[in-house]
């Protein structure tokens, strides 16, 4: 299966940074790997990338299409700027009260408008039961009838901590996610791994069942980030 790499820039960067991304990415050499760049909303217009296998995403999306959503940005607005992916349910959104039910609404809004949601799921601590993954997936997909989505497994305790699960733990989690989607009638779904992925461990993580990565911090180190992307493509 073709690998997918998603760069979540979170609340980082400025106009000059995204100009550098725009220029640097022209020299990126990828053949079989798809790359999605997710800058903050205000910098989406700064990334006009006319290349196959490189797409623009966002870090959140409105939960409804109504115009009565102060502070939200709807799918039709995003599509005007070439957005084709949206991260939904990231742990940092869940930490400020975003529920499984709200995630499911955002998933519906995305797929109803031709935007592919990247649905984030993950357990809070090393001791947490992985059954939470099953619940998160089932509720997230409860309102849709399409396989146009991606799931990103991010153990919350690993994000930005420098710690990562063992490969066996990652495989166990991904197997639970894929078994859940298969029982719901969705086959061949991409499941990414996210959480402290860097230039030193990505090759080992490629031996897991993950279909790619959701990246955070390393996305800001452009030389290392693009080297990682090319390394995945050549693996």
Protein language model features and the residues they cover:
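Active-site loop-to-helix "anion-binding N-cap" substructures in soluble metabolic enzymes
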Residues: 1-235
């Amino acid at each position: 299966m073709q690998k997918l790499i998603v760069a979540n820039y979170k609340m980082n960067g400025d106009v000059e940074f995204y100009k550098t991304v725009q220029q640097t990415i022209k020299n990126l050499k990828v053949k079989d790997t798809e790359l999605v760049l997710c800058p903050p909303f205000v910098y989406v217009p700064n990334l006009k990338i006319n290349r196959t296998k490189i797409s623009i995403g966002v870090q959140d999306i409105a939960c409804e299409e109504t115009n009565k959503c102060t502070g939200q940005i709807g799918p039709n607005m995003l599509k005007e700027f070439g957005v084709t992916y949206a991260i939904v349910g990231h742990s940092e959104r869940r930490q400020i009260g975003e529920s499984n039910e709200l995630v499911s609404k955002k998933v519906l809004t995305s797929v109803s408008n031709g935007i592919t949601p990247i649905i984030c799921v993950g357990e809070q601590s090393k001791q947490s039961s992985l059954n939470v993954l099953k619940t998160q997936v089932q509720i997230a997909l409860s309102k849709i009838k399409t396989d146009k989505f991606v799931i990103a497994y991010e153990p919350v305790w690993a994000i930005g901590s420098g710690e990562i699960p063992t490969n066996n733990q990652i495989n166990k989690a991904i197997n639970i996610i894929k078994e859940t989607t298969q029982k719901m009638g969705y086959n061949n779904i991409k499941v990414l791994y996210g959480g402290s992925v860097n230039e030193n461990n990505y090759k080992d993580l490629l031996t897991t069942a993950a279909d790619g990565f959701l990246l955070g911090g390393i996305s800001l180190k452009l030389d290392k980030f693009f080297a990682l992307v090319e390394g995945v493509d050549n693996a």
